[in-house]
Design a protein with these regions (language model features):
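Alpha-helical transmembrane segments and membrane-interface helix-loop junctions
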Residues: 1-171
Length: 171
């Protein structure tokens, strides 16, 4: 293994770890929702805070899992145009792929830049969701997961850009 591939390997391991964490959150939500449904129907006692937990977790799950989707080439997109361009005009298609990665990195970087103060405010003000005395949950863990996922996504875009330029697809 070359020294140059170590950062990419570390990025891919971190990306896979975030994906696994997102999957574990999904499993946790399934357990919580099933427990809530059983509690409502069998004991007329719903589980407190389920809507709050779900609303915070869904966004965190998306941000934790989208870097792996990009890495695996499974990010949702329309391939019809780009596939036909790869056959007829490969340089143009490669340029469009590079442009997609650059714009993706730019947009995700803007999200990171805008989200950082939101995370800091959430931590310093001890923000929470729910009703005091019934159920409260801090918001910062979900916001931290969003920041981690967005950072991994930006780094995956950068890795794709570097790989495209190394392969010489753009001349």
């Amino acid at each position: 293994m070359s020294v140059a591939s170590l950062p990419l390997r570390a990025l891919n391991i971190a990306t896979q770890g975030a994906n696994i964490l997102g999957t574990l959150l999904i499993v946790g939500l399934v357990v919580i929702i099933c427990t809530d449904v059983l509690g409502r129907n069998l004991f007329d006692a719903p589980l407190s805070g389920v809507p709050e937990m779900i609303s915070l977790s869904i966004v965190a799950i998306v941000f934790l899992q989208v870097p792996q989707a990009l890495r695996a080439g499974r990010l949702t997109r329309s391939d019809g145009l780009i596939d036909s361009l790869h056959r007829s005009r490969p340089r143009l298609a490669s340029g469009m792929e590079l442009l997609f990665d650059l714009l993706g990195c730019l947009v995700v970087s803007a999200i990171i830049y805008a989200h950082w103060p939101i995370l800091i405010k959430s931590i310093t003000r001890n923000e929470f969701v729910g009703a005091v005395g019934n159920f409260t949950m801090p918001t910062w863990p979900a916001k931290l997961m969003i920041l981690i996922g967005a950072t991994l996504l930006a780094l995956q875009f950068i890795a794709r850009i570097i790989q495209r330029l190394k392969k010489g697809h753009i001349q």
